[in-house]
Each structure stands twice: as structure tokens, then as C-alpha cells.
Regions:
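Terminal, low-structured helical/coil segments at or just beyond the last alpha-helical repeat
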Residues: 1-5, 163-207
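Register position in tetratricopeptide repeats
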Residues: 17-18, 51-54, 86, 121, ...
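Hydrophobic/aromatic packing residues within the alpha-helices of TPR/SEL1-like helical repeat arrays
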Residues: 28, 62-65, 97, 132, ...
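Short coil turns that delineate tetratricopeptide repeat
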Residues: 36, 70-71, 105-106, 140, ...
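Alpha-solenoid helical repeat scaffolds
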Residues: 40-44, 74-79, 109-114, 144-148, ...
Length: 207
């Protein structure tokens, strides 16, 4: 057995959305007890541990999975890249994400988002920002993509573009998709970004 029954997947995903990670892990572990090499279950463990910020445990799970698949599974490579990002290992993360991106023909906005961030923080700022823009074109309703674009525009001192993205967020916040963070998180952060931009403009006027 390689897969998880659909009804159990729905239950696990619902528990993850409710942040009931321990309950989700219990269900996944019951599957792994019967089938220790169940690839979907191993991926679920990696994802849940990542959401719990248990990076080491998530790393072990995804390494085991990738070894089983000879490092040829885009989802496993994406998760491995994500975990390396959390450790600020931009070079290694970039390697895994690039392979995942190539295997999915650059069609997955989340892989593009993460790869773009890796390139940016590795020092290839223009290239990284370009991939974030591509991610936004593919899915303009992902709150994290919008948030990252605002961040990078501010870092690049492109305040007009940052403000445009802030306006976009405020206009579309009720229809945006949120995964690991809730709306309040983004509203608080983006409000601070907006105040920063206004302060910069005021400072420039006074100069």
C-alpha cells in the first residue's frame, strides 16, 4: 500500500487546518504501523512536523521518502527545499527547489515562490524577484505570495510597487488563501509595512 484512503486524507487535512497536529499524527502513525513505507503517510508526517516547527523530525521523514524515490519526486524535493530554507541553507534549498520546479515545468506557484526567495536571499535579487512575480501570475490569491512581494519590493526600495501590492491585499483580503498563517498575521505585518513606506515618504519630503 502506497496511498492513504481518501476519507482519511480528508480527515487529516481538516485536522491540520484546525491546527490539531497531534491528532493528525496519530491517524498517520496508525497507517505507518501497517505500512511503514507508505509514501503519502511519510509526506504527511513531514508536512505536519514542519507545521509544528519540528524541522529536524520533518527532515528525517522527507529524507527517508526521497531516498525511497531516488530523489525524483517533486513534492518530496519541494518539502526538502522548504526545510533547508528554514535553516537558511539557501544554496542547498535552491538545488532541491530547482529540480522540483523543472519536474513540474514551472507550473506550481508555491515552488516558484520558494525558489524565488532562495535566489533572492542567495544574492540573485533580481532573479529571485522575477520568480516571485511569476508565482503571482500563476496564483494571485495566495496571501504568502502577495506578502513576499511586498517584502521584497520594500527591500528593493520600490515603494510604489510595494504600495500597489498593499492596496491589492487590502482590496482582496477576503478572497485570499491562507495556509499556515491567519489573516490577522498578514494584516499586522502589512500595516507596519505601510507605516514604514509613509514614514520614508515623509522623510524624503522634509529633506
Amino acid at each position: 500500500m502506497v496511498y492513504i484512503p481518501e476519507e482519511l486524507i480528508d480527515e487529516i487535512e481538516e485536522l491540520k487546518e484546525l491546527w490539531k497536529y497531534d491528532e493528525a499524527i496519530r491517524i498517520v502513525n496508525s497507517i505507518l504501523m501497517r505500512d511503514p513505507k507508505n509514501e503519502d503517510a511519510i509526506l504527511q508526517i513531514a508536512d505536519i512536523q514542519y507545521r509544528k516547527w519540528e524541522i529536524g523530525k520533518a527532515d528525517k521523514a522527507v529524507d527517508f521518502l526521497n531516498a525511497q524515490k531516488n530523489n525524483n519526486d517533486p513534492l518530496g524535493l519541494y518539502i526538502k527545499g522548504l526545510l533547508e530554507m528554514e535553516k537558511n541553507n539557501w544554496k542547498d534549498a535552491r538545488k532541491y527547489l530547482l529540480k522540483a520546479m523543472e519536474m513540474t515545468n514551472a507550473s506550481n506557484h508555491e515552488i516558484l515562490r520558494c525558489y524565488g526567495l532562495c535566489e533572492y536571499w542567495y544574492g540573485n535579487r533580481e532573479k529571485g524577484l522575477s520568480f516571485l512575480k511569476d508565482a503571482f501570475v500563476i496564483d494571485n490569491k495566495d496571501a504568502e505570495v502577495v506578502y513576499n512581494l511586498i517584502q521584497l519590493y520594500i527591500l528593493e526600495q520600490e515603494y510604489k510597487k510595494a504600495q500597489e501590492m498593499i492596496s491589492y491585499f487590502n482590496k482582496n483580503k477576503d478572497s485570499l488563501k491562507f495556509v499556515d498563517k491567519e489573516l490577522d498575521f498578514y494584516q499586522t505585518k502589512i500595516s507596519l509595512f505601510e507605516k514604514f513606506i509613509k514614514a520614508k515618504k515623509l522623510f524624503q519630503i522634509r529633506k
